[in-house]
Protein backbone atom coordinates (compact mmCIF):
# COMPACT_ATOMS: atom_id res chain seq x y z
CA UNK A 1 0.00 0.00 0.00
CA UNK A 2 1.53 3.34 -0.98
CA UNK A 3 2.17 5.81 1.82
CA UNK A 4 -0.25 8.71 1.52
CA UNK A 5 0.67 12.09 2.93
CA UNK A 6 -1.57 15.03 2.26
CA UNK A 7 -1.54 18.20 4.33
CA UNK A 8 -4.84 19.88 5.19
CA UNK A 9 -6.02 22.88 7.19
CA UNK A 10 -9.36 21.71 8.53
CA UNK A 11 -12.02 19.01 8.36
CA UNK A 12 -15.40 20.09 6.96
CA UNK A 13 -18.57 18.10 7.50
CA UNK A 14 -21.22 18.64 4.84
CA UNK A 15 -23.69 17.01 2.48
CA UNK A 16 -22.39 14.51 -0.07
CA UNK A 17 -24.01 14.05 -3.47
CA UNK A 18 -25.08 10.53 -4.56
CA UNK A 19 -22.30 10.62 -7.19
CA UNK A 20 -19.66 11.39 -4.55
CA UNK A 21 -20.90 8.57 -2.29
CA UNK A 22 -20.57 6.20 -5.26
CA UNK A 23 -17.03 7.49 -5.94
CA UNK A 24 -16.01 6.69 -2.35
CA UNK A 25 -16.81 3.00 -2.80
CA UNK A 26 -16.61 2.32 -6.54
CA UNK A 27 -13.53 0.82 -8.22
CA UNK A 28 -13.00 -0.59 -11.71
CA UNK A 29 -11.04 -3.86 -11.95
CA UNK A 30 -8.59 -4.61 -14.85
CA UNK A 31 -11.31 -6.73 -16.49
CA UNK A 32 -13.53 -3.58 -16.51
CA UNK A 33 -15.78 -5.02 -13.82
CA UNK A 34 -17.09 -2.25 -11.52
CA UNK A 35 -17.17 -3.26 -7.83
CA UNK A 36 -18.25 -1.41 -4.70
CA UNK A 37 -21.98 -2.06 -4.35
CA UNK A 38 -22.94 -4.23 -1.37
CA UNK A 39 -25.95 -6.29 -2.45
CA UNK A 40 -26.05 -9.19 0.05
CA UNK A 41 -26.70 -9.02 3.81
CA UNK A 42 -24.36 -11.97 4.55
CA UNK A 43 -21.11 -11.37 6.44
CA UNK A 44 -18.99 -14.54 6.56
CA UNK A 45 -19.53 -18.15 5.45
CA UNK A 46 -20.31 -20.30 8.49
CA UNK A 47 -18.22 -23.25 7.19
CA UNK A 48 -15.17 -21.62 5.64
CA UNK A 49 -15.31 -18.49 7.88
CA UNK A 50 -14.37 -16.48 4.78
CA UNK A 51 -16.22 -13.29 3.81
CA UNK A 52 -19.16 -13.77 1.44
CA UNK A 53 -18.81 -12.13 -1.98
CA UNK A 54 -20.85 -8.92 -2.43
CA UNK A 55 -21.68 -9.08 1.29
CA UNK A 56 -20.82 -6.71 4.12
CA UNK A 57 -17.25 -8.08 4.41
CA UNK A 58 -16.67 -8.79 0.69
CA UNK A 59 -12.96 -9.05 -0.18
CA UNK A 60 -13.54 -7.91 -3.77
CA UNK A 61 -15.05 -4.62 -2.55
CA UNK A 62 -13.01 -3.93 0.59
CA UNK A 63 -9.73 -5.79 0.01
CA UNK A 64 -8.23 -9.11 1.17
CA UNK A 65 -8.82 -10.41 4.71
CA UNK A 66 -5.21 -11.74 4.82
CA UNK A 67 -2.10 -9.89 3.65
CA UNK A 68 -1.10 -10.66 0.03
CA UNK A 69 -3.71 -13.43 -0.38
CA UNK A 70 -6.76 -13.46 -2.65
CA UNK A 71 -10.14 -15.01 -1.72
CA UNK A 72 -9.76 -18.24 -3.72
CA UNK A 73 -6.09 -18.78 -2.74
CA UNK A 74 -4.62 -18.65 -6.25
CA UNK A 75 -2.19 -15.85 -5.28
CA UNK A 76 -0.45 -16.13 -1.90
CA UNK A 77 2.77 -14.07 -1.76
CA UNK A 78 3.96 -10.49 -1.62
CA UNK A 79 5.55 -10.96 -5.04
CA UNK A 80 2.02 -10.88 -6.55
CA UNK A 81 1.50 -7.34 -5.21
CA UNK A 82 -1.11 -5.36 -7.16
CA UNK A 83 -2.40 -8.32 -9.22
CA UNK A 84 -6.19 -8.75 -9.38
CA UNK A 85 -7.15 -12.44 -9.30
CA UNK A 86 -8.92 -13.54 -12.50
CA UNK A 87 -11.07 -16.07 -10.63
CA UNK A 88 -12.31 -14.14 -7.56
CA UNK A 89 -11.55 -10.53 -8.54
CA UNK A 90 -9.70 -9.74 -5.28
CA UNK A 91 -6.67 -7.44 -5.46
CA UNK A 92 -3.51 -8.91 -3.88
CA UNK A 93 -2.49 -6.25 -1.35
CA UNK A 94 -2.21 -5.61 2.40
CA UNK A 95 -5.25 -6.38 4.55
CA UNK A 96 -5.09 -2.94 6.18
CA UNK A 97 -6.79 -1.46 3.10
CA UNK A 98 -9.95 -2.85 4.76
CA UNK A 99 -9.63 0.04 7.23
CA UNK A 100 -10.25 2.71 4.60
CA UNK A 101 -11.92 1.16 1.52
CA UNK A 102 -15.64 1.88 1.49
CA UNK A 103 -18.64 0.39 -0.26
CA UNK A 104 -22.15 1.62 -0.95
CA UNK A 105 -25.76 0.43 -1.03
CA UNK A 106 -27.91 1.59 -3.95
CA UNK A 107 -31.41 2.11 -2.57
CA UNK A 108 -34.48 0.92 -4.47
CA UNK A 109 -36.33 4.03 -3.24
CA UNK A 110 -34.97 7.32 -1.89
CA UNK A 111 -35.03 7.97 1.89
CA UNK A 112 -34.61 11.20 3.87
CA UNK A 113 -31.57 11.84 6.06
CA UNK A 114 -32.83 11.79 9.66
CA UNK A 115 -30.36 14.50 10.80
CA UNK A 116 -31.84 17.02 8.38
CA UNK A 117 -35.43 15.94 9.02
CA UNK A 118 -35.44 15.54 12.81
CA UNK A 119 -32.59 17.87 13.78
CA UNK A 120 -33.29 21.01 15.80
CA UNK A 121 -34.08 23.09 13.83
CA UNK A 122 -35.28 20.83 11.00
CA UNK A 123 -33.47 22.09 7.87
CA UNK A 124 -35.85 20.18 5.63
CA UNK A 125 -38.95 21.76 7.18
CA UNK A 126 -37.29 25.21 7.16
CA UNK A 127 -36.38 24.96 3.47
CA UNK A 128 -39.81 23.67 2.44
CA UNK A 129 -41.46 26.33 4.64
CA UNK A 130 -43.73 23.66 6.11
CA UNK A 131 -44.37 22.50 9.69
CA UNK A 132 -42.16 19.57 10.72
CA UNK A 133 -45.23 17.47 11.55
CA UNK A 134 -46.49 17.82 7.97
CA UNK A 135 -43.10 16.86 6.47
CA UNK A 136 -42.95 13.80 8.77
CA UNK A 137 -46.42 12.71 7.68
CA UNK A 138 -45.31 12.82 4.03
CA UNK A 139 -42.00 11.00 4.68
CA UNK A 140 -43.55 8.19 6.74
CA UNK A 141 -46.47 7.61 4.30
CA UNK A 142 -49.26 9.04 6.47
CA UNK A 143 -50.30 11.83 4.06
CA UNK A 144 -50.07 12.79 0.39
CA UNK A 145 -48.72 16.15 -0.75
CA UNK A 146 -49.84 18.09 -3.83
CA UNK A 147 -46.86 18.51 -6.19
CA UNK A 148 -48.88 20.17 -8.96
CA UNK A 149 -52.48 21.37 -8.41
CA UNK A 150 -53.15 21.44 -12.18
CA UNK A 151 -56.44 23.17 -12.96
CA UNK A 152 -58.16 22.18 -9.69
CA UNK A 153 -59.43 25.21 -7.76
CA UNK A 154 -59.74 23.29 -4.51
CA UNK A 155 -56.06 22.24 -4.43
CA UNK A 156 -52.90 24.24 -3.72
CA UNK A 157 -49.16 23.52 -4.00
CA UNK A 158 -47.76 21.64 -0.92
CA UNK A 159 -51.28 20.96 0.38
CA UNK A 160 -51.57 17.77 2.46
CA UNK A 161 -54.23 15.18 1.59
CA UNK A 162 -55.38 12.17 3.57
CA UNK A 163 -55.86 8.76 1.94
CA UNK A 164 -59.64 9.28 1.69
CA UNK A 165 -59.29 12.77 0.21
CA UNK A 166 -56.89 11.50 -2.48
CA UNK A 167 -59.18 8.55 -3.38
CA UNK A 168 -62.07 11.01 -3.75
CA UNK A 169 -60.00 13.29 -6.07
CA UNK A 170 -58.76 10.22 -8.00
CA UNK A 171 -62.34 9.13 -8.61
CA UNK A 172 -63.13 12.61 -9.97
CA UNK A 173 -60.05 12.58 -12.26
CA UNK A 174 -60.94 9.20 -13.80
CA UNK A 175 -64.67 9.88 -14.17
CA UNK A 176 -65.91 10.33 -17.78
CA UNK A 177 -67.08 13.93 -17.42
CA UNK A 178 -63.99 15.11 -15.50
CA UNK A 179 -62.47 18.48 -16.39
CA UNK A 180 -59.51 18.00 -13.99
CA UNK A 181 -56.07 17.56 -15.50
CA UNK A 182 -52.39 18.13 -14.64
CA UNK A 183 -52.89 17.18 -10.96
CA UNK A 184 -49.88 15.49 -9.43
CA UNK A 185 -49.52 14.25 -5.84
CA UNK A 186 -46.78 12.29 -4.11
CA UNK A 187 -45.96 10.50 -0.88
CA UNK A 188 -42.80 9.45 0.91
CA UNK A 189 -39.23 10.65 0.48
CA UNK A 190 -39.69 10.81 -3.33
CA UNK A 191 -42.32 13.54 -2.88
CA UNK A 192 -40.05 15.47 -0.48
CA UNK A 193 -37.17 15.12 -2.96
CA UNK A 194 -39.37 16.55 -5.72
CA UNK A 195 -40.39 19.51 -3.51
CA UNK A 196 -36.74 20.19 -2.66
CA UNK A 197 -35.72 20.02 -6.33
CA UNK A 198 -38.40 22.62 -7.16
CA UNK A 199 -36.69 25.19 -4.89
CA UNK A 200 -34.56 27.62 -6.93
CA UNK A 201 -32.12 28.76 -4.25
CA UNK A 202 -30.91 32.06 -5.78
CA UNK A 203 -34.44 33.19 -6.74
CA UNK A 204 -35.79 32.16 -3.33
CA UNK A 205 -32.99 34.07 -1.56
CA UNK A 206 -33.78 37.26 -3.51
CA UNK A 207 -37.50 36.97 -2.73
CA UNK A 208 -36.77 36.41 0.97
CA UNK A 209 -34.50 39.47 1.14
CA UNK A 210 -37.31 41.62 -0.27
CA UNK A 211 -39.86 40.12 2.14
CA UNK A 212 -37.56 40.63 5.16
CA UNK A 213 -37.47 44.38 4.47
CA UNK A 214 -41.27 44.59 4.83
CA UNK A 215 -41.78 42.01 7.61
CA UNK A 216 -41.71 42.54 11.39
CA UNK A 217 -41.50 40.54 14.58
CA UNK A 218 -41.92 36.76 14.53
CA UNK A 219 -42.50 36.60 10.78
CA UNK A 220 -39.24 38.48 10.11
CA UNK A 221 -37.28 36.14 12.41
CA UNK A 222 -38.72 33.12 10.56
CA UNK A 223 -37.77 34.58 7.16
CA UNK A 224 -34.22 35.35 8.37
CA UNK A 225 -33.85 31.77 9.64
CA UNK A 226 -34.94 30.39 6.25
CA UNK A 227 -32.66 32.79 4.35
CA UNK A 228 -29.68 31.75 6.49
CA UNK A 229 -30.22 28.06 5.58
CA UNK A 230 -30.58 28.90 1.87
CA UNK A 231 -27.43 31.08 1.94
CA UNK A 232 -25.51 28.19 3.53
CA UNK A 233 -26.63 25.84 0.74
CA UNK A 234 -25.57 28.38 -1.89
CA UNK A 235 -22.25 29.09 -0.10
CA UNK A 236 -21.26 25.41 0.19
CA UNK A 237 -22.43 24.52 -3.31
CA UNK A 238 -24.73 21.81 -1.92
CA UNK A 239 -28.03 20.94 -3.52
CA UNK A 240 -31.19 20.71 -1.44
CA UNK A 241 -32.22 17.28 -2.74
CA UNK A 242 -28.97 15.78 -1.39
CA UNK A 243 -30.78 15.67 1.99
CA UNK A 244 -32.70 12.77 0.44
CA UNK A 245 -30.45 9.72 0.05
CA UNK A 246 -30.53 7.38 -2.93
CA UNK A 247 -27.10 5.84 -2.15
CA UNK A 248 -25.83 4.96 1.34
CA UNK A 249 -22.10 4.64 2.12
CA UNK A 250 -20.91 1.45 3.83
CA UNK A 251 -18.00 2.15 6.16
CA UNK A 252 -14.86 -0.07 5.93
CA UNK A 253 -15.26 -3.54 7.51
CA UNK A 254 -12.32 -3.21 9.91
CA UNK A 255 -14.12 -0.25 11.54
CA UNK A 256 -17.14 -2.52 12.28
CA UNK A 257 -15.31 -5.81 12.92
CA UNK A 258 -16.55 -9.32 13.53
CA UNK A 259 -14.32 -11.33 15.90
CA UNK A 260 -14.41 -14.99 16.89
CA UNK A 261 -14.74 -15.73 20.62
CA UNK A 262 -13.25 -18.69 22.51
CA UNK A 263 -16.39 -20.84 22.29
CA UNK A 264 -16.53 -20.56 18.51
CA UNK A 265 -19.22 -17.87 18.64
CA UNK A 266 -18.83 -14.48 16.98
CA UNK A 267 -19.06 -10.98 18.40
CA UNK A 268 -19.94 -8.29 15.90
CA UNK A 269 -20.37 -4.53 15.78
CA UNK A 270 -23.95 -3.24 16.02
CA UNK A 271 -23.44 -1.46 12.70
CA UNK A 272 -23.40 -4.81 10.89
CA UNK A 273 -26.89 -5.61 12.22
CA UNK A 274 -28.14 -2.17 11.18
CA UNK A 275 -26.61 -2.48 7.69
CA UNK A 276 -28.09 -5.98 7.36
CA UNK A 277 -31.60 -4.64 8.10
CA UNK A 278 -31.17 -1.95 5.42
CA UNK A 279 -29.92 -4.45 2.79
CA UNK A 280 -32.66 -7.00 3.54
CA UNK A 281 -35.43 -4.41 3.27
CA UNK A 282 -33.85 -2.82 0.20
CA UNK A 283 -33.59 -6.18 -1.62
CA UNK A 284 -37.17 -7.08 -0.64
CA UNK A 285 -38.43 -3.70 -1.94
CA UNK A 286 -36.55 -4.16 -5.25
CA UNK A 287 -38.11 -7.62 -5.65
CA UNK A 288 -41.63 -6.29 -4.90
CA UNK A 289 -41.18 -3.50 -7.46
CA UNK A 290 -39.94 -6.05 -10.00
CA UNK A 291 -43.01 -8.28 -9.65
CA UNK A 292 -45.33 -5.21 -9.68
CA UNK A 293 -46.71 -5.87 -6.19
CA UNK A 294 -49.75 -3.89 -4.95
CA UNK A 295 -49.01 -0.26 -4.09
CA UNK A 296 -49.94 -0.66 -0.41
CA UNK A 297 -47.33 -3.43 0.05
CA UNK A 298 -44.62 -1.46 -1.79
CA UNK A 299 -45.43 1.63 0.26
CA UNK A 300 -45.17 -0.30 3.53
CA UNK A 301 -41.78 -1.68 2.46
CA UNK A 302 -40.57 1.83 1.56
CA UNK A 303 -41.59 3.04 5.03
CA UNK A 304 -39.71 0.14 6.64
CA UNK A 305 -36.64 0.96 4.52
CA UNK A 306 -36.86 4.60 5.69
CA UNK A 307 -36.99 3.44 9.33
CA UNK A 308 -34.04 1.06 8.80
CA UNK A 309 -31.88 3.88 7.36
CA UNK A 310 -32.99 6.18 10.22
CA UNK A 311 -31.85 3.54 12.74
CA UNK A 312 -28.50 3.13 10.94
CA UNK A 313 -27.77 6.87 10.96
CA UNK A 314 -29.26 7.77 14.35
CA UNK A 315 -30.99 4.99 16.28
CA UNK A 316 -33.76 6.29 18.54
CA UNK A 317 -33.98 9.77 16.99
CA UNK A 318 -37.44 8.92 15.65
CA UNK A 319 -39.83 6.09 16.35
CA UNK A 320 -39.02 2.91 18.23
CA UNK A 321 -35.37 2.28 19.11
CA UNK A 322 -33.94 -0.82 17.44
CA UNK A 323 -32.62 -3.21 20.12
CA UNK A 324 -30.38 -6.25 19.98
CA UNK A 325 -29.77 -9.03 22.50
CA UNK A 326 -30.78 -8.28 26.14
CA UNK A 327 -32.93 -5.38 24.89
CA UNK A 328 -29.83 -3.23 24.47
CA UNK A 329 -30.24 -0.37 21.96
CA UNK A 330 -27.97 -0.86 18.93
CA UNK A 331 -25.19 1.71 18.56
CA UNK A 332 -25.72 3.72 15.37
CA UNK A 333 -23.28 5.91 13.41
CA UNK A 334 -24.39 9.01 15.38
CA UNK A 335 -23.86 7.25 18.73
CA UNK A 336 -20.29 6.39 17.68
CA UNK A 337 -19.56 10.03 16.82
CA UNK A 338 -21.41 12.05 19.44
CA UNK A 339 -21.13 12.58 23.18
CA UNK A 340 -18.37 12.28 25.74
CA UNK A 341 -17.51 8.71 24.71
CA UNK A 342 -17.78 9.54 20.99
CA UNK A 343 -15.04 9.53 18.39
CA UNK A 344 -14.35 13.28 18.56
CA UNK A 345 -14.24 13.91 22.31
CA UNK A 346 -12.85 10.53 23.38
CA UNK A 347 -10.38 9.66 20.62
CA UNK A 348 -9.50 12.82 18.70
CA UNK A 349 -9.68 15.68 21.21
CA UNK A 350 -9.04 13.59 24.33
CA UNK A 351 -6.12 11.43 23.27
CA UNK A 352 -3.99 9.77 25.95
CA UNK A 353 -0.46 11.13 25.72
CA UNK A 354 2.91 9.72 26.77
CA UNK A 355 4.56 10.98 29.98
CA UNK A 356 1.22 11.60 31.65
CA UNK A 357 -0.76 9.97 34.44
CA UNK A 358 -4.03 10.39 36.32
CA UNK A 359 -5.09 9.79 39.90
CA UNK A 360 -7.38 10.92 42.70
CA UNK A 361 -6.28 13.98 44.68
CA UNK A 362 -6.02 14.16 48.47
CA UNK A 363 -5.02 17.06 50.70
CA UNK A 364 -1.30 17.48 51.46
CA UNK A 365 -1.17 19.82 54.49
CA UNK A 366 2.59 19.40 55.02
CA UNK A 367 3.44 20.46 51.46
CA UNK A 368 4.68 23.90 50.49
CA UNK A 369 2.46 25.75 48.06
CA UNK A 370 4.68 25.02 45.05
CA UNK A 371 4.91 21.29 45.82
CA UNK A 372 2.70 18.31 45.08
CA UNK A 373 2.87 14.75 46.35
CA UNK A 374 3.50 12.31 43.49
CA UNK A 375 2.95 8.58 44.18
CA UNK A 376 6.19 6.60 43.78
CA UNK A 377 4.47 4.07 41.52
CA UNK A 378 3.42 6.85 39.14
CA UNK A 379 6.70 8.78 39.35
CA UNK A 380 8.87 5.78 38.38
CA UNK A 381 6.68 5.25 35.30
CA UNK A 382 6.64 8.92 34.27
CA UNK A 383 10.35 9.53 34.79
CA UNK A 384 11.52 6.08 33.59
CA UNK A 385 13.59 7.34 30.61
CA UNK A 386 15.38 9.86 32.86
CA UNK A 387 16.01 7.18 35.51
CA UNK A 388 17.38 4.75 32.89
CA UNK A 389 19.67 7.46 31.47
CA UNK A 390 21.04 8.25 34.94
CA UNK A 391 21.50 4.56 35.85
CA UNK A 392 23.59 4.05 32.70
CA UNK A 393 25.43 7.35 33.28
CA UNK A 394 26.39 6.33 36.83
CA UNK A 395 27.60 2.93 35.61
CA UNK A 396 25.05 1.01 37.70
CA UNK A 397 23.87 -0.84 34.56
CA UNK A 398 25.28 -1.30 31.06
CA UNK A 399 22.17 -1.14 28.89
CA UNK A 400 18.50 -0.18 28.81
CA UNK A 401 17.29 -3.78 29.21
CA UNK A 402 19.26 -4.21 32.44
CA UNK A 403 17.95 -0.85 33.73
CA UNK A 404 14.34 -1.90 33.04
CA UNK A 405 14.93 -5.19 34.88
CA UNK A 406 16.25 -3.23 37.86
CA UNK A 407 13.14 -1.03 37.84
CA UNK A 408 10.79 -4.03 37.59
CA UNK A 409 12.51 -5.63 40.60
CA UNK A 410 11.97 -2.43 42.63
CA UNK A 411 15.65 -2.38 43.56
CA UNK A 412 16.29 0.10 46.46
CA UNK A 413 18.89 1.97 44.36
CA UNK A 414 16.07 3.00 41.99
CA UNK A 415 14.41 5.25 44.57
CA UNK A 416 17.64 7.15 45.28
CA UNK A 417 18.14 7.74 41.55
CA UNK A 418 14.48 8.77 41.16
CA UNK A 419 14.89 11.33 43.99
CA UNK A 420 17.88 12.82 42.14
CA UNK A 421 15.98 12.88 38.82
CA UNK A 422 12.87 14.66 40.10
CA UNK A 423 14.81 17.27 42.07
CA UNK A 424 14.22 20.54 40.25
CA UNK A 425 12.14 18.83 37.53
CA UNK A 426 8.63 20.35 37.72
CA UNK A 427 5.47 18.50 36.71
CA UNK A 428 2.21 20.03 35.49
CA UNK A 429 -1.10 19.23 37.13
CA UNK A 430 -4.34 19.71 35.20
CA UNK A 431 -7.91 19.38 36.41
CA UNK A 432 -10.68 19.10 33.83
CA UNK A 433 -12.52 21.20 32.86
CA UNK A 434 -9.67 23.66 32.22
CA UNK A 435 -11.79 26.81 32.10
CA UNK A 436 -8.96 29.33 32.57
CA UNK A 437 -5.18 29.32 32.46
CA UNK A 438 -4.88 28.47 36.18
CA UNK A 439 -6.58 25.13 35.48
CA UNK A 440 -3.09 23.80 34.70
CA UNK A 441 -0.15 24.72 36.97
CA UNK A 442 3.37 23.48 37.65
CA UNK A 443 4.59 21.95 40.92
CA UNK A 444 7.79 20.45 42.28
CA UNK A 445 7.08 16.75 42.87
CA UNK A 446 7.66 15.15 46.27
CA UNK A 447 7.64 11.33 46.32
CA UNK A 448 4.89 9.93 48.54
CA UNK A 449 3.59 6.47 49.39
CA UNK A 450 0.10 5.41 48.34
CA UNK A 451 -1.59 5.93 45.00
CA UNK A 452 -3.13 9.40 45.38
CA UNK A 453 -1.70 12.74 44.25
CA UNK A 454 -1.29 15.15 47.18
CA UNK A 455 -2.27 18.76 46.57
CA UNK A 456 -1.77 21.89 48.70
CA UNK A 457 -5.18 23.16 49.88
CA UNK A 458 -4.39 26.78 48.90
CA UNK A 459 -4.32 26.01 45.16
CA UNK A 460 -7.77 24.37 45.21
CA UNK A 461 -9.76 27.54 44.29
CA UNK A 462 -7.68 28.00 41.09
CA UNK A 463 -8.44 24.41 40.02
CA UNK A 464 -11.98 24.54 41.47
CA UNK A 465 -10.97 21.28 43.13
CA UNK A 466 -12.13 19.59 46.29
CA UNK A 467 -11.23 16.29 47.87
CA UNK A 468 -14.46 14.34 47.41
CA UNK A 469 -13.07 12.09 44.67
CA UNK A 470 -11.78 14.63 42.15
CA UNK A 471 -9.11 13.38 39.74
CA UNK A 472 -6.19 15.27 38.23
CA UNK A 473 -3.81 14.57 35.36
CA UNK A 474 -0.01 14.83 35.64
CA UNK A 475 2.14 15.83 32.65
CA UNK A 476 5.95 15.85 32.54
CA UNK A 477 7.61 18.70 30.59
CA UNK A 478 10.49 17.02 28.74
CA UNK A 479 12.70 19.67 27.13
CA UNK A 480 14.85 22.12 29.12
CA UNK A 481 12.85 25.01 27.61
CA UNK A 482 9.54 23.48 28.72
CA UNK A 483 10.90 22.85 32.21
CA UNK A 484 12.17 26.41 32.62
CA UNK A 485 8.88 27.86 31.34
CA UNK A 486 6.94 25.66 33.74
CA UNK A 487 9.16 26.79 36.64
CA UNK A 488 9.10 30.50 35.81
CA UNK A 489 5.57 31.01 34.45
CA UNK A 490 3.42 28.15 35.67
CA UNK A 491 4.68 27.44 39.19
CA UNK A 492 1.76 27.64 41.63
CA UNK A 493 3.55 30.14 43.90
CA UNK A 494 3.84 32.54 40.91
CA UNK A 495 0.10 32.45 40.23
CA UNK A 496 -1.39 34.09 43.30
CA UNK A 497 -3.60 36.62 41.49
CA UNK A 498 -6.51 35.71 39.22
CA UNK A 499 -5.81 36.80 35.61
CA UNK A 500 -9.52 37.57 35.21
CA UNK A 501 -10.09 39.92 38.16
CA UNK A 502 -6.63 40.76 39.50
CA UNK A 503 -7.75 39.68 42.97
CA UNK A 504 -5.99 36.96 44.98
CA UNK A 505 -7.16 33.51 43.95
CA UNK A 506 -4.99 31.83 46.60
CA UNK A 507 -7.26 32.21 49.61
CA UNK A 508 -7.57 29.90 52.61
CA UNK A 509 -10.93 28.19 52.89
CA UNK A 510 -12.75 25.37 54.64
CA UNK A 511 -10.25 23.20 56.56
CA UNK A 512 -7.59 25.93 56.73
CA UNK A 513 -10.00 28.54 58.12
CA UNK A 514 -11.45 26.00 60.54
CA UNK A 515 -7.97 24.94 61.66
CA UNK A 516 -6.81 28.55 62.17
CA UNK A 517 -9.99 29.28 64.13
CA UNK A 518 -9.62 26.18 66.30
CA UNK A 519 -5.96 26.92 67.10
CA UNK A 520 -6.67 30.48 68.23
CA UNK A 521 -10.14 30.06 69.78
CA UNK A 522 -11.18 30.55 73.44
CA UNK A 523 -12.43 27.39 75.12
CA UNK A 524 -13.18 27.89 78.85
CA UNK A 525 -14.02 24.20 79.21
CA UNK A 526 -10.48 23.03 78.27
CA UNK A 527 -8.17 24.80 80.75
CA UNK A 528 -5.96 21.99 82.06
CA UNK A 529 -2.59 23.52 83.10
CA UNK A 530 -3.90 27.09 82.96
CA UNK A 531 -1.86 29.75 84.77
CA UNK A 532 1.52 27.98 84.40
CA UNK A 533 4.63 29.98 83.57
CA UNK A 534 7.06 29.01 80.78
CA UNK A 535 10.55 30.31 80.02
CA UNK A 536 9.90 30.47 76.25
CA UNK A 537 7.59 29.64 73.36
CA UNK A 538 9.25 26.28 72.69
CA UNK A 539 8.77 25.23 76.34
CA UNK A 540 5.04 25.94 76.11
CA UNK A 541 4.71 23.90 72.88
CA UNK A 542 6.70 21.04 74.46
CA UNK A 543 4.38 21.06 77.50
CA UNK A 544 1.36 20.85 75.15
CA UNK A 545 2.92 17.94 73.23
CA UNK A 546 3.51 16.15 76.56
CA UNK A 547 -0.15 16.83 77.46
CA UNK A 548 0.81 19.00 80.47
CA UNK A 549 -1.44 21.81 79.22
CA UNK A 550 -4.48 21.95 76.94
CA UNK A 551 -4.34 23.61 73.52
CA UNK A 552 -6.72 26.37 74.70
CA UNK A 553 -5.43 26.80 78.27
CA UNK A 554 -4.23 30.33 79.14
CA UNK A 555 -0.58 30.22 80.24
CA UNK A 556 2.13 32.83 80.88
CA UNK A 557 5.08 32.68 78.46
CA UNK A 558 8.24 34.76 78.61
CA UNK A 559 8.56 36.88 75.47
CA UNK A 560 10.92 39.87 75.50
CA UNK A 561 10.02 41.14 72.01
CA UNK A 562 7.62 43.97 71.17
CA UNK A 563 3.93 43.22 71.79
CA UNK A 564 0.94 45.05 70.33
CA UNK A 565 -2.10 43.98 72.32
CA UNK A 566 -3.95 47.32 72.50
CA UNK A 567 -3.50 47.48 76.29
CA UNK A 568 -1.08 50.45 76.43
CA UNK A 569 -3.97 52.79 77.35
CA UNK A 570 -5.06 50.50 80.20
CA UNK A 571 -3.88 51.49 83.69
CA UNK A 572 -1.71 48.59 84.96
CA UNK A 573 -1.41 47.32 88.53
CA UNK A 574 2.03 48.39 89.76
CA UNK A 575 4.06 46.65 92.49
CA UNK A 576 7.48 47.83 93.64
CA UNK A 577 9.74 45.46 95.57
CA UNK A 578 12.28 46.42 98.22
CA UNK A 579 15.18 46.29 95.73
CA UNK A 580 13.38 48.77 93.42
CA UNK A 581 12.15 46.23 90.83
CA UNK A 582 8.82 47.40 89.36
CA UNK A 583 6.22 44.85 88.19
CA UNK A 584 3.48 46.17 85.86
CA UNK A 585 0.51 43.82 85.44
CA UNK A 586 -1.84 44.26 82.44
CA UNK A 587 -4.73 41.85 81.66
CA UNK A 588 -2.53 39.99 79.10
CA UNK A 589 1.01 41.05 80.04
CA UNK A 590 3.38 41.18 83.01
CA UNK A 591 6.46 43.39 82.73
CA UNK A 592 9.37 43.57 85.24
CA UNK A 593 11.81 46.48 85.12
CA UNK A 594 14.74 47.39 87.38
CA UNK A 595 15.09 50.71 89.22
CA UNK A 596 16.61 52.30 86.09
CA UNK A 597 13.60 51.24 83.94
CA UNK A 598 15.54 48.57 82.03
CA UNK A 599 13.38 45.58 81.00
CA UNK A 600 14.18 42.47 83.05
CA UNK A 601 11.46 40.17 81.68
CA UNK A 602 8.08 40.21 79.95
CA UNK A 603 5.45 37.48 80.19
CA UNK A 604 2.44 37.39 77.91
CA UNK A 605 -0.85 35.58 78.56
CA UNK A 606 -1.70 33.32 75.62
CA UNK A 607 -2.57 29.73 74.66
CA UNK A 608 -0.36 26.96 73.17
CA UNK A 609 -2.63 27.03 70.09
CA UNK A 610 -1.91 30.71 69.45
CA UNK A 611 1.82 30.13 70.01
CA UNK A 612 1.80 27.33 67.38
CA UNK A 613 -0.13 29.57 64.95
CA UNK A 614 2.26 32.51 65.42
CA UNK A 615 5.39 30.33 65.27
CA UNK A 616 4.27 28.73 61.98
CA UNK A 617 3.78 32.14 60.35
CA UNK A 618 7.07 33.54 61.72
CA UNK A 619 9.04 30.47 60.57
CA UNK A 620 7.53 30.77 57.06
CA UNK A 621 8.41 34.47 56.86
CA UNK A 622 11.94 33.81 58.09
CA UNK A 623 12.54 31.08 55.49
Curated annotation (Swiss-Prot):
Cofactor-binding details, from the entry: Binds 1 Mg(2+) ion per subunit. Binds 1 Zn(2+) ion per subunit.
GO cellular component terms, A-Z: DNA-directed RNA polymerase complex
Catalysis performed (reactions): RNA(n) + a ribonucleoside 5'-triphosphate = RNA(n+1) + diphosphate
Cofactor(s) annotated in UniProt: Mg(2+); Zn(2+)
Entry keyword Flavoprotein: no
E.C. number(s) listed in UniProt: 2.7.7.6
An example Gene Ontology biological process: DNA-templated transcription
Keywords: DNA-directed RNA polymerase, Magnesium, Metal-binding, Nucleotidyltransferase, Transcription, Transferase, Zinc
Residues noted as binding Mg(2+) in the record, renumbered to the chain: 466, 468, 470
Function: DNA-dependent RNA polymerase catalyzes the transcription of DNA into RNA using the four ribonucleoside triphosphates as substrates.
NCBIfam families: PRK02625.1, rpoC1_cyan
Protein name as catalogued: DNA-directed RNA polymerase subunit gamma
Taxonomic placement: Bacteria, Bacillati, Cyanobacteriota, Cyanophyceae, Acaryochloridales
Encoding gene per record: rpoC1
Amino acid sequence: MPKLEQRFDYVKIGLASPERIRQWGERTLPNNQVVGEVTKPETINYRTLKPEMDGLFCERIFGPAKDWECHCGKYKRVRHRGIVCERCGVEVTESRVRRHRMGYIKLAAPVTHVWYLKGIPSYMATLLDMPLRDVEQIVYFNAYVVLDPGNADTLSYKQLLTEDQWIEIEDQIYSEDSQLEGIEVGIGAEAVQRLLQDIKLETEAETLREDIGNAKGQKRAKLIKRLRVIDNFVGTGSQTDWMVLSVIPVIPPDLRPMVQLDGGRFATSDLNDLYRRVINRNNRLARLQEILAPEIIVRNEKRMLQEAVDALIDNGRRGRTVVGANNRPLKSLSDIIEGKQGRFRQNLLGKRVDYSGRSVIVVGPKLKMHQCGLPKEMAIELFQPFVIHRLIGQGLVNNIKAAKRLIQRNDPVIWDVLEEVIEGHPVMLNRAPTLHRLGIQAFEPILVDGRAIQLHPLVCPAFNADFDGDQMAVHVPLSIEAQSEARLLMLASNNILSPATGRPIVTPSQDMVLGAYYLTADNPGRQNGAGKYFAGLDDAIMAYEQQQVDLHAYVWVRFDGPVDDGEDDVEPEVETSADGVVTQTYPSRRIRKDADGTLISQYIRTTPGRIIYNKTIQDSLAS
